[in-house]
Amino acid sequence: MFKINALNNLFVQFFDSINKFVYNIVPDKNYSYGLAIIILTIIIKTLLVPFSIKQIKSSVLMNALQPELKKLQTKLKSDPQKLQQETMKLYKEKNVNPFGGCLLLIIQYPILIALYYVFYSLHIKGIGFLWIHDLSQKATFSNWTTWILPIVSGATTYLSGILTMPPSSDPAQRKQTTTMNIGMSIFLLWMSWNFSAALVLYWTVSNLFQMAQSKIIITAVTAKLEAEKNSVEDSSNIISQNIDNKKNKKNKKK
């Protein structure tokens, strides 16, 4: 309990410092709080970049391994124990951690809980941002403008999920990923409807940041893997060519 309270208090103090800094530049609470939330989100997401790289790299590598995994599943479908051993052996050979993407999710939940406490503790009742009339309030059916942020939150959750998980060559894997993304988006839409606008704003900005970040990381990781693949192919071609040259020399001597 002490550790949780300490984390919550740390986030409150950190956000308060950011808000004071923003307020000195933009002395209007209807802008400073919203801008402070956006800046806080960018800082948190920047600190989590190493974990995001690990998650996305793991996804790209797992996707690249799908053809080989399929072959193993077909070859050893009658021997589950052997299949598991060979699968783990393949992961080890390719330096792939199948659970490499889980750490980011585990880290994000305590942060989300701490921010819930932050926005609950702050006196932001009546303070708005852009079209948001009150950052402390949840969405209501009576005011359609409060629907916008939860809907955007759900939509960006779905798009972020698509970009974070590179397209798979396996139709079953694609279907599973799509179903998971839709389910997560609906869940986050429901959560966004029941949380304060301040927390939903954090999650939405976090998704937008993640989308841009994922695009950059996937492009870089894919290019690196392609370069490594081409390098291996070039090395194989050189070796084959050297072998052929040696054979030709022997034949000429004969």
Curated annotation (Swiss-Prot):
Transmembrane as UniProt keyword: yes
GO cellular component: plasma membrane
Compartments where located: Cell membrane
The keyword Oxidoreductase belongs to this UniProt entry's keyword annotation: no
Keywords: Cell membrane, Chaperone, Membrane, Protein transport, Transmembrane, Transmembrane helix, Transport
Region (Disordered): 233-254
Family: Belongs to the OXA1/ALB3/YidC family. Type 1 subfamily.
Name of the protein described by the UniProt record: Membrane protein insertase YidC
